[in-house]
């Protein structure tokens, strides 16, 4: 990952780097890999995440249809 520093503005470059890492999911992956996760726990977590995403999508869809 590469970020250019313009006008010696390191703070702005650091913010850009953090934003890129966040978008790529690096922080989330690091957090998940801090400890070993059993395959059964991983499967349960992924299933719960999928359910959460589906509910969120349904909520947004209902809100859009309700607004029309």
Curated annotation (Swiss-Prot):
Keywords: Ribonucleoprotein, Ribosomal protein. Pfam families: Ribosomal_S21 (PF01165). The lineage of its organism: Bacteria, Pseudomonadati, Pseudomonadota, Alphaproteobacteria, Rhodobacterales. This is Small ribosomal subunit protein bS21. One of its GO terms (biological process) is translation. It comes from Dinoroseobacter shibae (strain DSM 16493 / NCIMB 14021 / DFL 12). It comes from the Bacteria. Belongs to the bacterial ribosomal protein bS21 family. One of its GO terms (molecular function) is structural constituent of ribosome. One of its GO terms (cellular component) is ribosome.
